């Protein structure tokens, strides 16, 4: 009798995805982040579900309902902080996953890559709307500032912003719809993840060398299932250390003050994982220009398959490109730091230089270095 996992219509899909999947024999720990992102998504959906059971999306009661979750609900504080810090772990894994893709040339699977970029946008939108829900000062003013950016769109901008707000300012209607969208988006993300995996399994995984690995494949289970479990244990360890020892490390103290439309906080800033994009937004004095730069800072990822000039796929054997890649990483750290600083000298000029460097490295320097490295191959 044939094994049920190979014949059952539903189980065989799981079998081809996680058990008998042929995987390259040399993929490193950098390939663990896909499964870690899956675990993050599951953690976020489960903790979010339990939070939604006790949360009320009304301006009068939202803040106190979060307080009630933390004080009165059994392990409510744990669920709330796992959800808040789970978002941070999600973004750490996301950035490392994208960085891995850039370094090893995984973007040459362009359907998989483009779905991944769409996923990044969807996760960022979800995180932004989630940050608004506790209805603290930074929630309210963050929502006001970021939604207001859409007013920079010519002709329809103001109408669009008021339509999103559901009124003439961020208010009850805004909070209610943000809660609805924050609830539905993770399920849309889950569907997109399945499409992401579908396209990935059409081609098979990339590997550190960037070479075709068809001649040397091993089954996903038990080799990579065990490897993924190790990664998952380390992820949960890191998350629980954060949640149980310093749950507010990555949060903003202003969000422990209930939202007050009459009092603006001295420094409005988003969560740490948006700071690099926020710094790029602020580095351009023009509103529309800033918004375009903000969107392009993420959308530029879709250009990588077009900008790939090298004859080699991976950066493993390209030391000059490696050097430039790590300068780009350092530049992103600089932008993240600048995004959290007040708008004053010398931070303004540092932010502008870092923003210019970000786009220059991606659009000009990396392709130019790739062409130079192609020339070196002939020496």
Swiss-Prot record:
A Pfam family recorded for this sequence: Cytochrom_B_C
Positions of transmembrane segments: 33-53, 77-98, 113-133, 178-198, 226-246, 288-308, 320-340, 347-367
Function: Component of the ubiquinol-cytochrome c reductase complex (complex III or cytochrome b-c1 complex) that is part of the mitochondrial respiratory chain. The b-c1 complex mediates electron transfer from ubiquinol to cytochrome c. Contributes to the generation of a proton gradient across the mitochondrial membrane that is then used for ATP synthesis.
Residues that, per the record, bind a ubiquinone: 201
Subunit and partners: The cytochrome bc1 complex contains 11 subunits: 3 respiratory subunits (MT-CYB, CYC1 and UQCRFS1), 2 core proteins (UQCRC1 and UQCRC2) and 6 low-molecular weight proteins (UQCRH/QCR6, UQCRB/QCR7, UQCRQ/QCR8, UQCR10/QCR9, UQCR11/QCR10 and a cleavage product of UQCRFS1). This cytochrome bc1 complex then forms a dimer.
Record GO terms (molecular function): metal ion binding; ubiquinol-cytochrome-c reductase activity
Name of this protein: Cytochrome b
Membrane-topology annotation of the record: Multi-pass membrane protein
UniProt: heme b b562 binding residues: 83, 182
Gene field: MT-CYB
Sorted UniProt keywords: Electron transport, Heme, Iron, Membrane, Metal-binding, Mitochondrion, Mitochondrion inner membrane, Respiratory chain, Transmembrane, Transmembrane helix, Transport, Ubiquinone
Cofactor, how bound (note): Binds 2 heme b groups non-covalently.
GO CC, alphabetical: mitochondrial inner membrane; respiratory chain complex III
Cofactor: heme b
Note: Heme 1 (or BL or b562) is low-potential and absorbs at about 562 nm, and heme 2 (or BH or b566) is high-potential and absorbs at about 566 nm.
Family membership noted in the UniProt record: Belongs to the cytochrome b family.
Localization in the cell: Mitochondrion inner membrane
InterPro entries hit by this protein: Cyt_b/b6_C (IPR005798), Cyt_b/b6_C_sf (IPR036150), Cyt_b/b6_N (IPR005797), Cytb/b6-like_sf (IPR027387), Cytochrome_b (IPR030689), Cytochrome_b_C_euk/bac (IPR048260), Cytochrome_b_N_euk/bac (IPR048259), Di-haem_cyt_TM (IPR016174)
GO biological process terms, semicolon-separated: mitochondrial electron transport, ubiquinol to cytochrome c
Binding site for heme b b566: 97, 196
């Amino acid at each position: 009798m044939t094994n049920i996992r190979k014949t059952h219509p539903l189980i065989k899909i799981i079998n081809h995805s996680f058990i008998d999947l042929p995987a390259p024999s040399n993929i490193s720990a950098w390939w663990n982040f896909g499964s870690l992102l899956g675990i993050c998504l599951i953690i976020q959906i489960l903790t979010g579900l339990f939070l939604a059971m006790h949360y009320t999306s009304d301006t009068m009661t939202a803040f106190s309902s979060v307080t009630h979750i933390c004080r009165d609900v059994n392990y409510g504080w744990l669920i709330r902080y796992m959800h808040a810090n789970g978002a941070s772990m999600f973004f750490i894994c996301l950035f490392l996953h994208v960085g891995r893709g850039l370094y090893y040339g995984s973007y040459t699977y362009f359907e998989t890559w483009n779905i991944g970029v769409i996923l990044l946008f969807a996760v960022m939108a979800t995180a932004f709307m989630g940050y608004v829900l506790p209805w603290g000062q930074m929630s309210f003013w963050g929502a006001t500032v970021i939604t207001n950016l859409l007013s920079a769109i010519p002709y329809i901008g103001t109408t669009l912003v008021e339509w999103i707000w559901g009124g003439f300012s961020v208010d009850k209607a805004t909070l209610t719809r943000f809660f609805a969208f924050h609830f539905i988006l993770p399920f849309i993300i889950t569907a997109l993840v399945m499409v992401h995996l579908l396209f990935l399994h059409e081609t098979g995984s990339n590997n550190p060398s960037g070479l075709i690995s068809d001649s040397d494949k091993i089954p996903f289970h038990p080799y990579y299932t065990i490897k993924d479990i190790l990664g998952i244990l380390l992820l949960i360890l890191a998350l629980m250390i954060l949640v149980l020892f310093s749950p507010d490390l990555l949060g903003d103290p202003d969000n422990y003050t209930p939202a007050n439309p009459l009092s603006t906080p001295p420094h409005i800033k988003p969560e740490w994982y948006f700071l690099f994009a926020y710094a790029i937004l602020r580095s351009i004095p023009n509103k529309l220009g800033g918004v375009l730069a903000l969107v392009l800072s993420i959308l530029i990822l879709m250009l990588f398959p077009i900008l790939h000039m090298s004859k080699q796929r991976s950066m493993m054997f390209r030391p000059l490109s490696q050097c430039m890649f790590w300068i780009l990483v350092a530049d992103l750290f600089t932008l993240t730091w600048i995004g959290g600083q007040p708008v004053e000298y010398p931070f303004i000029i540092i932010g502008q230089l870092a923003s210019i460097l970000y786009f220059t490295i991606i659009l000009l320097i990396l392709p130019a270095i790739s062409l130079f490295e192609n020339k070196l191959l002939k020496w």
